[in-house]
Swiss-Prot record:
Keywords: Amino-acid biosynthesis, Cytoplasm, Histidine biosynthesis, Lyase. The keyword Ribosomal protein does not apply. This is Imidazole glycerol phosphate synthase subunit HisF. The gene is hisF. Pfam families: His_biosynth (PF00977). It is found in: Cytoplasm. Heterodimer of HisH and HisF. Its EC number is 4.3.2.10. It catalyses: 5-[(5-phospho-1-deoxy-D-ribulos-1-ylimino)methylamino]-1-(5-phospho-beta-D-ribosyl)imidazole-4-carboxamide + L-glutamine = D-erythro-1-(imidazol-4-yl)glycerol 3-phosphate + 5-amino-1-(5-phospho-beta-D-ribosyl)imidazole-4-carboxamide + L-glutamate + H(+). PANTHER family: IMIDAZOLE GLYCEROL PHOSPHATE SYNTHASE HISHF, IMIDAZOLE GLYCEROL PHOSPHATE SYNTHASE SUBUNIT HISF/H IGP SYNTHASE SUBUNIT HISF/H. The active site is at D11, D130. It comes from Oleidesulfovibrio alaskensis (strain ATCC BAA-1058 / DSM 17464 / G20) (Desulfovibrio alaskensis).
Length: 259
């Protein structure tokens, strides 16, 4: 059995680490470079960096921060936010990222996934999906809709269909973020995570809602996810990554332990 992954997520606004609830009320909680280094030293399996306002503001990602984070850690590092072209992908990868996460840019231009995969390999292309629960309709039969620009714009796209399409286009991984659960610490959206995990053959990362090791265990088992993205649970010092991994492994889910 492959070890499951724990991935701290750094949401960055104006060069600072922030966190909100359901993509609202973000507060400054520190320096993203220092936080990345701390999580790396604690045993994080990967780090994800999101420039959370780049797409909405129509600008590129903060490459200087990407470079600083990349030079401070020696684990896989994914960046997202403002990745709208293959050149944006190239710039992020050249700055030190191993993977790029496309979200709003891929919704607007799905071919960016296939172009990026052809140039850099599928392993470097992550589809980020921001999803809201809605009443099922003919256009959205799964009851989960794709939203972009930090949840500000509803796209009328079915999340399940989009995940399948992205896999065909060449995405190597999908990060499924429930905006309904984001920052609540009430647990991941397991129905959504399981639905996507069962529908695709590529790894799925569960995102949004971690408040306890049991939530992560559920996402990695009941939800079928390969990895759990976390933020508030470690940003505010409630748990360290060793705490989380030990408890999750004790529940019966294999983790990579480095201490």
């Amino acid at each position: 059995m492959l070890s499951k992954r724990i991935i701290p997520c750094l949401d960055v606004r104006d060069g600072r680490l922030t966190k909100g609830i359901k993509f609202q009320g973000n507060v400054d909680i520190g320096d993203p470079v220092e936080s990345a280094r701390r999580y790396y030293e604690q045993g994080a399996d990967e780090i994800v960096f999101y420039d959370i306002t780049a797409s909405h503001e129509g600008r590129g990602i903060f490459l200087d921060i990407v470079e600083k984070v990349a030079s401070s850690i020696f684990i896989p590092f994914s960046v997202g936010g403002g990745i709208n072209t293959v050149d944006d992908m190239r710039d992020a990868l050249n700055a030190g990222a191993e993977k790029v996460s496309v979200n709003s840019g891929a919704v607007k231009d799905p071919d960016i996934i296939s172009k990026g995969a052809a140039r850099f390999g599928s392993q470097a292309i992550v589809l980020g999906m921001d999803v809201k629960r809605v009443a099922p309709t003919e256009a959205i039969p799964s009851g989960y809709e794709i939203v972009i620009h930090g949840g500000r714009k509803h796209m009328g796209m079915d999340a399940l269909d989009w995940a399948k399409t992205a896999e065909v286009l060449g995405a190597g991984e999908i990060c499924v973020n429930s905006i309904d659960a984001d920052g609540t610490k009430d647990g991941y959206e397991l129905t959504l995570t399981r639905m996507i995990s069962d529908a695709v053959q590529i790894p799925v990362i569960a995102s949004g809602g971690a408040g306890h090791p049991a939530h992560m265990y559920d996402a990695l088992t009941k939800g079928g996810a390969s990895a759990a993205l976390i933020a508030s649970i470690v940003h505010y010092g409630e748990y360290t990554i060793p705490d989380l991994k030990k408890q999750i492994q004790a529940m019966g889910c294999k983790m990579r332990l480095t201490w």
